Design a protein with these regions (language model features):
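Short hydrophobic "helix-edge" motifs at membrane interfaces and signal-peptide entry regions
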Residues: 24, 41, 249-250
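Compositionally biased, low-structure terminal segments
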Residues: 4-6, 31, 295, 321-322
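Residue-level marker of intrinsically disordered, low-complexity segments enriched
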Residues: 2-3, 18, 31, 35-40, ...
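Amphipathic alpha-helical segments typified by the pilin-like N-terminal helix
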Residues: 27-67
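Compositionally biased, low-complexity segments
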Residues: 6, 13-15, 43, 301, ...
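N-terminal leader/signal peptides at the extreme start of proteins
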Residues: 1-30
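Short, well-structured segments within or immediately adjacent to enzyme catalytic domains
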Residues: 66, 70-336
Length: 336
C-alpha cells in the first residue's frame, strides 16, 4: 500500500516557468530627430531627381515633335510622287476652278483633275484637311507634343464622309478643320486651330520653285511655328507661345524639316544654313518666318522665292497671302 502511494506521488511536477513565453528583446525605434533626417534626405533626393526627370521628358517631347514633322513631310512627298511635276500637295489643284463648257449643254462644271488652280483654296486649313481626307497624314500627327497655345487642339472628329468628288457640287475635304490660330479661345466654334505646324507660304516663286519633292537640303518646308513675322526682340518675341516649345523657355528654338526630309532643331529664326539672294542683293541669311521686303535691289517681296513659313488663312490671291497673327501669351494680338 505504501509502495502504491509512493508510486503515485512520484510523478514529476511541471515547472511553472515553462508555460510562460520568453520576454522578447526590447527593440529601439526611430527617434523624432532620426525620422526628420530621413525625410530631409528623401526630399533632397526628390529635388535633385525631379529637374532631371523634367528635362528628360521635355527632350523626349522634342524628339517626338521632330518625328511628327518628318512624318507630315513624308506624306507630302508621297503625294508629290503621284504628281507629274513632283509638286507637294496644293489644295487649289485638288479643288480646281470649274471648266467652262464641260457640263451638260455647254455649262460650266467642276471636273476632278481638270481646270485651273483655285488659288483661293491654298490656305493652311485646306492644305492639311485635304491631306487627311486622302489618308496621307492623320489628325494626330498635326498636333505637336510640345504645343502650349490653348487655341491649338487635336481634331478628334474629322468627317471623312465630306470627301465626295463625284457629287454635283464636289467636296474634297472636311471644311470643319480649322487653322484659326489668330482667334481668341471661346470666340465661337471656329475659334480653334487643328494644327501646330507652319509650312512654306503657298504663293509666288517660293511655291513655284520649292513646293516640290526637289527642294533640297537647305530649303525649309515646314516645322514649328515662329514668332510673329520672325521677331527676335520686344513683346512679339518675349510673349510668344513659340518660346515655350523647347528648352530653354526664354529663347526660340524650333524643329524645321528641309526638302530632303531631314529635321533640325534650329536655334534661331535666322538659321545659319538658310540663305537667299535676289536681284542685286547679295547672298544673306534668311529670316524663315517673314518674307524679305528689301527696299531696293529688284526683289519682289511677298511673291519672292525666299523662305516664309506661316499658317495661312483666308483666301489667297496671286499677289497676297495672309499669315495668321498668333496671339501672345497675354491674349493680345502681336504688334504689326
Amino acid at each position: 500500500m505504501d509502495c502504491m502511494f509512493a508510486h503515485r506521488n512520484s510523478r514529476p511536477h511541471p515547472d511553472p516557468s515553462a508555460s510562460v513565453p520568453p520576454r522578447p528583446a526590447w527593440r529601439r525605434g526611430f527617434t523624432l530627430v532620426e525620422l526628420l533626417v530621413v525625410v530631409a534626405i528623401i526630399a533632397l533626393l526628390i529635388s535633385l531627381l525631379l529637374p532631371a526627370l523634367g528635362r528628360a521628358q521635355r527632350a523626349a517631347k522634342t524628339l517626338n515633335d521632330a518625328a511628327n514633322i518628318s512624318q507630315i513631310h513624308k506624306g507630302f512627298l508621297s503625294h508629290a510622287n503621284s504628281d507629274p511635276k513632283g509638286r507637294l500637295p496644293t489644295p487649289g489643284l485638288v479643288s480646281r476652278l470649274p471648266v467652262p463648257g464641260a457640263g451638260p449643254g455647254g455649262a460650266t462644271a467642276t471636273v476632278p483633275g481638270q481646270g485651273e488652280e483655285d488659288i483661293s483654296k491654298n490656305n493652311t486649313a485646306s492644305l492639311y484637311s485635304s491631306m487627311i481626307a486622302a489618308n496621307f497624314v492623320t489628325p494626330e500627327i498635326l498636333y505637336s507634343p510640345v504645343e502650349e497655345n490653348p487655341i491649338v487642339r487635336q481634331m478628334t472628329n474629322y468627317n471623312f464622309q465630306a470627301y465626295n468628288p463625284a457629287a454635283p457640287a464636289p467636296t474634297f475635304w472636311d471644311p470643319g478643320f480649322y487653322a484659326n490660330i489668330h482667334l481668341a479661345p471661346g470666340a465661337g466654334a471656329s475659334a480653334v486651330c487643328h494644327t501646330s505646324y507652319a509650312h512654306l507660304a503657298l504663293i509666288g516663286d517660293r511655291k513655284k520653285l520649292y513646293w516640290t519633292n526637289r527642294a533640297g537640303s537647305t530649303r525649309p518646308i515646314l516645322g514649328n511655328r515662329g514668332t510673329h513675322r520672325g521677331a527676335f526682340s520686344g513683346d512679339n518675341y518675349r510673349l510668344s507661345y513659340t518660346l515655350l516649345f523647347h528648352d530653354p523657355k526664354d529663347t526660340w528654338e524650333g524643329n524645321i524639316c528641309f526638302g530632303d526630309n531631314h529635321v533640325n532643331l534650329e536655334k534661331s529664326v535666322i538659321p545659319d544654313t538658310v540663305q537667299f539672294e535676289c536681284g542685286s542683293i547679295n547672298l544673306k541669311k534668311d529670316n524663315i518666318y517673314t518674307y524679305d521686303d528689301f527696299n531696293s535691289g529688284g526683289c519682289k517681296g511677298m511673291v519672292e522665292g525666299d523662305t516664309w513659313l506661316c499658317i495661312g488663312i483666308g483666301q489667297p490671291v496671286p499677289n497676297f497671302y495672309t499669315c495668321a497673327p498668333e496671339r501672345l501669351t497675354n491674349g493680345a494680338l502681336p504688334a504689326p
